Amino acid sequence: MSKLTVVGSINADLIVHAERHPQPGETLLGSGGEILAGGKGANQAVAAAQLGANVAFVGAVGSDPYAEPAMYYMRTSGIDLGAVEQADTNTGLAVITCLLYTSDAADE
């Protein structure tokens, strides 16, 4: 098994489902909000672990409610989090925008 140490960011991705993308200045109500693990380094570490590597991670999260969800998939993927520090600050956050377009002709 390959050994790998990843040094990078751990963020919490905030995902809210909406019926459509808002217009400039418009407020839409969302539903089904989720907090998922994210961050370039964390995503790379999880991918490597899922491919069978023995992964250790070096990074930091904040001491706020987003820290645990941000590390959830890393922990459940078997990544060694012994070098992850918990800083007296906020965990990095990202708001994810994803648009899915389908053609009316694709009613299969």
Give, region by region, the residue ranges found by the protein language model.
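A structure-centric signal for secondary-structure junctions around beta-strands
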Residues: 1, 90-92
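Glycine-rich phosphate/adenosyl-contacting loop at the front of the ribokinase-like
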Residues: 1-60, 65-69, 75
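A glycine-rich helix N-cap at a beta->alpha junction
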Residues: 77-88
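Short beta-strand scaffold segments in enzyme catalytic cores
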Residues: 93-97
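Conserved small/polar residues in nucleotide/adenosyl-binding loops
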Residues: 101-106
